Amino acid sequence: MKKQDEKTEMLEVTIQQKKIFIRQRDIYFLESMGRVVSIYCKNGVFKVYSRLGELEEKLDSDMFLRCNQSYIVNILWVSDIVDYDFYMPGDRLVPIRKRDKKEIIQKFYNKRNETDTHREKIH
């Protein structure tokens, strides 16, 4: 995973042989089903033929967290954590891998604190 800079704030994906760019801050979460990844964001849902791991490498590692085999969440959009789920916009629940729950939640709070600290320095 790479760190965010001005050149990587957009995620480049190919949909029906056309390259499109999605602002990473606008992505809520990514969901993988086989070789199709659904990217849920402010502008709707984009379906991409790819592996989740390939897209994960292009995402800002400070902003995104892999919470199980099939999902990556944008920590900026997590509104709550209840039991084994992240609550996302649109009342969507993203499951947290049960055996790694403590570690994943700790990573979430660490990333969230780093992001908040970085935001305070900018403003």
Please annotate each region the language model reported.
Residues M1-M10, E103, K107-H123:
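Inter-domain helical "communication" segments and dimerization helices
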Residues M1-P89, L93:
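Conserved binding/recognition cores within well-folded domains
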Residues D85-E114:
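An exposure/low-complexity boundary signal
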